[in-house]
Amino acid sequence: MVFTPFRLRELELKNRWIMLAMHTGFATGNALTERDYAFYEERAKGGAAAVTVLLAVNEAGALKGMYDAETVEKESLRTLAERVHAHDCRLIVQLFHCGRNESAKNHGEKPLLAPSAVASPIFRTEPQEMTAEELAKTKAAFANAAALCKEIGADIVEVSASAGYLLSEFFSPLTNQRTDVYGYQTENGMTYPLEALAAVRAAVGDFPILVKVSAAQMVEGGYELTDTLRFCKKAEDAGTIDGVTVTGGWHESPVEQISYHVSKGGYAPFAGALKKYLSVPVIACNRIHDAETAERILSQGLCDFCGTARAFLADAAFANRLQAGKPYLPCQSCNKCIAAVLKGKELFCAFNPEAGNEAFEHQRRKIATRKECIVIGGGPAGMEAAKKSAERGFVTTLLCREKELGGQLRLAALPPKKEGLLDYIAYMKATLAELGVTVLTETEATLDFIKERKPYFTVVATGSQPEKQPIEGLSDEKYFTAQEILQMPEEKIAEMLQGTVAILGGGAVGLETAAFLAQRLPEGAAEFGIKIIEQKEKMGMDMGAMARPLLNELKKKNVSFLTTTTATLMDGSKLYVKIGEMTLFVSADTVIWAGGGEPVVDTELTMWLMDERMSYAVVGDANEIGDGGTAIKDAYELYTHLYLA
């Protein structure tokens, strides 16, 4: 079903894949640039039935780096529509107002406007309660923006009333404390959003209009699914909408929305609940990143279209590759894209560094000759380097010491809910084969090998290794690295879990290793048999919001946490730790190092390359310790700055 056409009003869309709105942060002036055009055109070319671009209705409602309808150069929007239409793809423009959901720092001198002066728990900036004049102007801005979109050749407008942005703030008693006609006590706060939709309809006539809603606020005391249904039904009965896009909750919801902690298509039943009572088409959202999920929710009648933003962010040709049965770069739902946007940074994908750089890629794709490049290392940096090397025209050979490509990503895929990383490795393996890269596994990059081949260019991507903190009295028999634990035979893990375990390091590695072990805890295991010891004030500081669901899961498994704590001494099964000026001990039959590492570089090889004046570069963890995303970016950026004679 996913590749069958469907209609929205009188408008036919070629398939059921809708690329949802994403704030890119690319705007630096009032006119869209080639960077914007290339970003959306690649996804139109990649098989989306429609792509959605964000447009704030006015300057006050714009996020940092967002175009707004009051100041945007009209002809640049028209150019975008033409570029998208050239690929049998429709253009949706989402009409947006941030409301209170922006930081004062990023909003500049513009006041944050909201139904009431209630600060967002994310940004902690108190907005101004909108006056009657501001309400009228904003409503007119929605109408004017819609008229502009129709004029420049867009196909559909989508009115944003979701995720905690302005219009959705009227629905909630937590954010709408007004006492006038637009207050929550009047029609549960639906009056103003319904009037905004009516103004948009009056401005565009029979032009297709979508409304994007959160199925529920998913915050204690907030609005529920039944409230959202009533709103959508009122809008449908008034003739102001032609379809509904249904997402999950708000950004501040304690319930996970789009991370890998959410099951695939997990929020589609909310779309199905609305579809049961509405006659207009419904677009489902959240964690719909593969054909199986899309076919399932369509066949179950939960929706008419499948909306996804990040599947197209990860792979611009996502839909075309699916239809052709080809491998595609899968979204990992790591949420690093969302984290960047919420911090006022530009949109990016940790696993697809070309996202946002499509215009540059078009100019630079074939800069190399048929000279040889050897890439040493089969981890994320090595695979990306080999990919870009081949794309740039090098005859490329990748040397991998292990039996399989992937490096430390193979270990990172072992904790619960991280198996998607194996799909990324499989995609890269297929891509390298398609590009003609020679991959030599179980092959050491010896100095003799490099001397014999004398490649034009060598990329050293040999990764890193753990560097255990020495602890007095702790022997190797009891002291392991997280990497050793993840590779340990199951029977040895089971034996280890009969005792107590202390993990040194409460970052991503430590927390995910704890989850890996907690999943294997035997019945009747000692309470708090796994302890995580972290020197910093918080656990998971390198994970951002992704730490919260993982910490909750670990708490359910009785994993205990010690912060601002340093391990100092081991005596038998007593691990002495220092918390401020206080020293105490915790029980630990096994200690696991989940802290930092050190780069691995063959200095003899690199010195020889230097002495022979042969071109080489060191990338990824071998250059600077980071994570998989930074390693991939490092390798990618090497080739953006590589110029050949």
Where are these regions (language model features)?
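Rossmann-like dinucleotide-binding cores of NAD(P)H-dependent redox enzymes
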Residues: L398-L435, A515-A567, N623
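Generic beta-strand/beta-sheet core signal
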Residues: L20, Q94, S160-S162, S168, ...
